[in-house]
């Protein structure tokens, strides 16, 4: 099964200062009819989450100005329903533990392939859907 099919009904926000990554993912998503919005900085990402709801929020850790962890922390407050993915080129224990503490769903290390990222996103969405269904049954 094509993991892009799992993303067609989901809106994705990508925040990354790397133009190649932004352009590559935007092209990959749009050619598969998967909605994506890209931002170069955390500040642009915050503007995006004020303007629309996202199912998936992906952020690079190293960004100019506010870092990706601080951005995702704010994004989680505004859009707690979103799956949060942190992209990082650095294996840093503090970064990982802080990311888990603030609710980051998954990590992906650079370099990564579009195929690997899309598979991770599809899996994360499925997992979240199952967790919500279990939570809804538990409340009844």
Language model regions located:
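Non-catalytic signal-transmission and effector/linker regions of two-component phosphorelay proteins
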Residues: 1-11, 115-140
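Two-component/phosphorelay signaling modules centered on CheY-like receiver
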Residues: 19-37
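The feature encodes the CheY-like receiver
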Residues: 22, 64, 92
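Acidic, metal-coordinating helix/loop segments flanking the phosphotransfer/catalytic sites
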Residues: 38-56
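Acidic catalytic/metal-coordinating carboxylates
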Residues: 41, 67-70
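Short amphipathic alpha-helix used as the core "switch/output" element in two-component signaling
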Residues: 47, 69-81
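Active-site residues of response regulator receiver
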Residues: 60, 88
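Alpha4 helix (beta4-alpha4-beta5 surface) of REC/receiver domains from two-component response regulators
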Residues: 70, 91-106
């Amino acid at each position: 099964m094509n993991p892009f099919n799992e993303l067609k009904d989901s809106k994705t926000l990508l925040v990354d200062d790397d133009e190649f990554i932004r352009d590559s993912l935007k092209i990959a998503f749009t050619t598969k009819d998967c909605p994506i919005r890209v931002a170069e900085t955390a500040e642009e990402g915050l503007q995006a989450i004020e303007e629309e709801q996202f199912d998936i929020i992906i952020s690079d850790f190293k960004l100019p100005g506010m870092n990706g962890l601080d951005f995702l922390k704010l994004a989680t407050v505004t859009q707690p329903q979103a799956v949060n993915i942190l992209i990082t080129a650095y294996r840093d224990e503090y970064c990982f533990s802080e990311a888990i503490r603030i609710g980051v769903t998954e990590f992906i290390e650079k370099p990564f392939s579009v195929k690997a990222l899309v598979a991770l996103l599809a899996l994360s969405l499925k997992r979240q859907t199952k967790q919500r269904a279990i939570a809804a049954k538990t409340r009844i």
